[in-house]
Amino acid sequence: MSSEKLKTKPLIFSLSRNKRNNDILVKILGEQDYEVAGHTDPVNMVSDVKTRKKVNLVIMDISGFNQDIWKYCEALRLLDIPFLVLSPQQHRVIEEEGMKQGAKRVLVKPLVVKELLFLVKSLVEN
């Protein structure tokens, strides 16, 4: 068996309250040969992260979540899991809080897919 066949796909978690947006993100990332698990509940997402051997990246769409979402960002930071925050609007407070909690980047929707994929690839490969 070649080492190429033994290579595991990078695992990315997606979190969004909006199931349709989550499904789209899962599809786009899956087409790039990533293993992707979509979540709509941050509690379940963090629990799932803790049961996995390796999570390479989490993409969190904070739309529709209350201020408690930041404690889940902090949990990811403490677990040393890189994450991106997707925000419905450009707002300095959101960007500052995301970075304070350890986000690698705060992106404003709507997303440019090509840019998102470039960023995901660079984070997963590092």
Model-derived segments and their meaning:
Residues 27-32, 75, 97:
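Alpha-helical interaction/dimerization surfaces of two-component signaling modules
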